[in-house]
Each structure stands twice: as C-alpha cells, then as structure tokens.
C-alpha cells in the first residue's frame, strides 16, 4: 500500500514481490522512526523549555531509556540488512536462469538512447567492432560475419515474450548510464568496457517504461524507451517484422576496419551467460 502511495508502478516480474515486500517493510519502519523521533523531539522541546528550566543542566538525561531505544533501532536495522536485504540481493546477483531457457539480449547505451542486439534464428551474436560504427550501424556489427547476418538490432523499443526469463547484458558506447525498468524491479549500470548482466522474468503483457537512472549529459531527461511484453505469438511476429525491416540486422554496405585491423568479437556468446549459483 505504501509503495503505491509513493508512486511505485505495479509489479510485472516474477521476483518483484520480494523487492516490494522489503521496500514496504523499510518504508513502514522509516515512517515509525520519523513519527517516533518527531514525538520525542516535541516532548523534549516542551519538557525542557526555558521557563521550566531557566538554568542549563549539563548532566543531560539520566534515564537509560534513550540508550535502549537506540540499541533497538540498530538491532532492527542489522536484522533487516543481514537477514533480508543481503540474501535477497545475493539471489538476484548469483541465481541466473539457465542459458538455454533465457532470452539473451545485449543492451548498448549511448547518449541518449538504448540500443538492443538480439541473435537471429541461429542463436549466435555477430561480431561487433568500433571500426564499423556509423549512423546506419550504431552497434558496429561486422557485415562480413556470417553469424550476424540474421541478427536483429533495434533502438528505443524492445519486445520480449511473457513468462520467459530474460538476461540483459549491459554496456555503453560513451559514458556511464543506468538501465532501469521500474515495473520489472530491475536496474543496472551500463559502463564502457564492461558487460554487466541483469535478469528478470516478465509475467504480465503490456508496455513498460525504460529510463536512464544515471545522469549522463544534457539530454539525460529524454533518455527513455519502452519494453513491450508480448504473448509468444506476438513476439514471434515482432521478430519476423524486425528481421524484414533490418535486412538481417546488417548495414547495406560493408566498411573496412580502421588500420586494417581484424574486428574483435566484442559481445559475449549466449553460452557465456551466468548460470545458477555462479
């Protein structure tokens, strides 16, 4: 209840209820602290006002109640952190779905949009190299790599199937961004030179807002996108449409790599996705 009051959108992922429970507990705990300490503050203002105590008392409070209250607050916070927050975060970080079951998507952030790279029917990502980056090829897909001929590249909007785990591997072309999908209760930094995985399982069809949660420049306010959760049939139709529009994800004409260097395979292969417990 308090989460909705504070503006949190309805949960649309399988794990989101765990996040919501701990957030709601924290909010109620903070509310209790706020009203409790506010009442104590008002009591002190009245109890020790100048008219009743014209001379300052340098000994202070002689009762041990305040000390007990402080220790109780510290104990509750320690239980909340060690008993709930850390185990929940450990499960989110370490227990990835099996690679064969999950949809693997590379999310490449740039000022000021999110680009998505999906493998084609062969299940393999094509090579990417900065030497091939252009306005028509924002991810630098190697046009000479057979594995990338059927790849799908899209910007701003990503479609995923409902009830299927998704692993998003985050990276960036320029500065640090943060890929945040509030309805899915996931977020992660997109850092140049790093590949940072986050995962979730969408359980409700619909369109959900994607935002950048890291100040990344003058256009940060407009760095938004859409995550569309489809039925399996609609998702397959979208894949077919994107494959036709992108011509297999490849730019029309090949361009050589600068300096005659051989392009490197930048993205990780699908089999490299983290496995449960690792």
Residue positions per predicted region:
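Alpha-helical transmembrane segments
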Residues: 23-36
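Central hydrophobic cores of alpha-helical transmembrane segments in multi-pass inner-membrane proteins
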Residues: 36-47
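Non-transmembrane, membrane-proximal soluble domains of secreted or membrane proteins
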Residues: 1-25, 45-278
């Amino acid at each position: 209840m308090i989460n909705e009051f504070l503006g949190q959108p309805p949960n649309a992922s399988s794990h989101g209820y765990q996040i919501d429970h701990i957030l709601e507990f924290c909010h109620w705990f903070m509310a209790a602290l706020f009203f409790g300490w506010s009442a104590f503050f008002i009591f002190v203002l009245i109890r020790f006002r100048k008219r009743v105590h014209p001379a300052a008392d340098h000994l202070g409070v002689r009762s041990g109640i305040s000390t007990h209250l402080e220790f109780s607050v510290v104990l509750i916070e320690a239980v909340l952190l060690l008993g709930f927050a850390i185990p929940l975060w450990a499960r989110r970080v370490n227990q990835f779905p099996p690679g064969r079951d999950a949809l693997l998507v590379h999310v490449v952030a740039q000022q000021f949009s999110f680009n998505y790279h999906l493998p084609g029917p062969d299940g393999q990502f094509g090579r990417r190299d900065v030497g091939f980056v252009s306005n028509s090829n924002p991810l630098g897909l190697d046009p000479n790599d057979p594995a990338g001929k059927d790849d799908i590249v899209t910007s701003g909007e990503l479609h995923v199937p409902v009830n299927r785990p998704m692993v998003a591997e985050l990276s960036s072309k320029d500065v640090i961004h943060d890929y945040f999908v509030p309805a899915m209760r996931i977020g992660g930094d997109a850092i140049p030179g790093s590949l940072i995985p986050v995962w979730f399982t969408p359980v409700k069809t619909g369109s959900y807002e994607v935002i950048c949660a890291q100040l990344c420049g003058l256009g940060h306010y407009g760095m938004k996108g859409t995550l569309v959760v489809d039925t399996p049939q609609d998702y397959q139709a979208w894949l077919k449409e994107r494959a036709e529009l992108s011509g297999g994800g490849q730019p029309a004409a090949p361009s050589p790599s600068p300096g005659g260097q051989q392009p490197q395979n930048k993205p990780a292969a699908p089999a490299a996705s983290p496995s449960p417990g690792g």
